[in-house]
A protein has these predicted regions:
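Acidic/polar loop patches that form or flank catalytic/metal-binding clefts of enzymes
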Residues: 118-119, 143-148
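Charged/polar, low-hydrophobicity segments characteristic of intrinsically disordered regions
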Residues: 135, 148-150
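Extended alpha-solenoid helical-repeat scaffolds
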Residues: 152-157
């Protein structure tokens, strides 16, 4: 499945996302050119009892957001409701490749050319978050210096606090 919002999409909208539901697998997707995020999983504040849970995104291409902040996606669940990101390519997003809160597995992914907003953003919230981060590759792209710091100064992992356990 290919989802490409493009320049004619509504400003501030994600190319694809999940607000509620359970037991979903998104496989072999290409999600690009979002006007805010490319692919996000966020609970719907209008349905607090029906948060997304047990969701997997795998073998997918997520990238090339169009807005100036160009984001891969927000993956925000509770500490009990998990999301697995497995064997994906996050490419050419300035930030949020992804930004995660809650229960998350980030395994065997590639993040290329993450810009100055950070590659894997860890929580930055008071909410307890737990992540299993294994065997990922972070590849310096055209907007990064070879020392792993961006032109703006961000390393691959950012915004860690005491509420985020990896």
């Amino acid at each position: 499945l290919r989802i490409r919002m493009g320049v004619n999409g509504k400003d501030g909208k994600d190319a694809a996302g999940v607000a509620y539901g359970a037991n979903m697998i998104f496989d072999h997707m290409s999600v690009t050119w979002g006007r805010d995020e490319c692919f996000s999983i966020n609970g719907d504040p209008k349905k607090p009892g029906d948060q997304p849970r047990n969701i997997t995104i795998q073998n997918s291409f997520i990238g090339q957001g169009l807005q100036p902040h160009s984001c891969g996606g927000l993956i925000q669940t509770t500490a009990e409701n998990g999301v697995t990101l497995y064997r994906n390519l996050y490419i050419d997003n300035k930030t949020r490749n992804p930004k995660v809160k809650g229960l998350n597995q980030f395994v065997n992914n590639i993040v290329y050319n993450w810009g100055n907003g950070g590659a894997y953003i860890m929580g930055d919230t008071e909410q307890t978050s737990e992540a299993d981060i294994r065997n990922n590759y972070f590849i310096v792209g055209a907007t990064l210096n070879y020392d792993g710091k961006t032109l703006g100064s961000t390393a691959p992992f950012t915004r860690y606090n005491e509420h985020f356990r990896a």
